[in-house]
Amino acid sequence: MTQQRHNWTLKEVEALFTLPFNDLLFQAHSIHRKNFDPNQVQISSLLNIKTGACPEDCLYCSQSSKYDTGLEREKLMEIDLVLKQAKQAQDNGATRFCMGAAWRNPTDKSINKVIPMIQGVKDMGMETCVTLGMLTQKQAFVLKEVGLDYYNHNIDTSKENYSNIVTTRNFQDRLNTLESVQNANIRVCSGGILGLGEDQTDRASMLRSLSNLAIHPDSVPLNLLVPIPGTPFENIEPPTESEFIRTIAVARIMMPKSVVRLSAGRTKMGDTMQALCFFAGANSIFYGEQLLTTDNPNTDSDQDLFVRLGINQKQANNLQSV
């Protein structure tokens, strides 16, 4: 099953989730191997270029202005510092540099301040990605014109669970921005977070929403929630390791040609869990000790992991084999 489908039913997706674990991983790995080199992983790096004071009320987020998490508000980074961080990421093996700003929806003035950052990173020979919040169609076209490669806009969870995690926007708002980005021919990076109080049906529904987009996301980041003290979700029950690995596997089956990225939460994953995620179809990670406001394994730790697992870093453009 390597054909890209956009008509998955919820019943079909739930059936995948309930397969015996070994059967599910075998099916996912077989599809992964047909579309990618199973021993290659793409490396991205993520930088928070504007921290905190977000007006949204996402119950899990340290950057929301609604909660006292001890996070200090920081204004937009100067371009020289951004490019210095990008060069360091490139020297460490990253092929894509992602820049995130804690905005609900950026103003045109804010977009204009980010444009030189995008152009500077592109001039270094890296792929560019930004996550800036909800976009208008006009803003998406502007970002395309300046050469942006990827736009990240996660749907977070299922449509059914969405109002339980945020009230300042709705699920359709997320889809509208993804549509604007795809209309501008910018490649989409969109995934979700596990550990938001969702059940297996919610995970199935979330993946169904992603796979039934007009074009599958080029990248599907899947995050394991890192509970933040001071947020309403600071004591929420995390998913089990097998639940997370199952979600990776189902994502690979449903979106066979998308890059599936292990994102936040890897500090809680040992070698075995990460190895099973790679076997199930994950083929990208975020590199560097910080992901926005949460910790991430250091580069030496990841390099050691790659050596132990026999994994090679590859340029993003050379990752896909079919």
Curated annotation (Swiss-Prot):
Annotated [4Fe-4S] cluster binding lies at 54, 58, 61
Molecular function terms in GO for this entry?
2 iron, 2 sulfur cluster binding; 4 iron, 4 sulfur cluster binding; biotin synthase activity; iron ion binding
Keywords attached to this Swiss-Prot or TrEMBL record, sorted alphabetically, are: 2Fe-2S, 4Fe-4S, Biotin biosynthesis, Iron, Iron-sulfur, Metal-binding, S-adenosyl-L-methionine, Transferase
Entry binding sites for [2Fe-2S] cluster:
98, 129, 189, 261
Gene3D superfamilies (UniProt xref): Aldolase class I (3.20.20.70)
SUPFAM superfamilies according to UniProt: Radical SAM enzymes
Per the record, the domain of life is Bacteria
- Report the enzyme's class at the first EC level: transferase
Q: Name one GO biological process term.
A: biotin biosynthetic process
Q: Name one Pfam family in it.
A: BATS
**Which family would the database say this protein is a member of?**
Belongs to the radical SAM superfamily. Biotin synthase family.
Q: What does this protein do?
A: Catalyzes the conversion of dethiobiotin (DTB) to biotin by the insertion of a sulfur atom into dethiobiotin via a radical-based mechanism.
Q: What is this protein called?
A: Biotin synthase
Origin species: Vesicomyosocius okutanii subsp. Calyptogena okutanii (strain HA)
Gene name tied to this protein: bioB
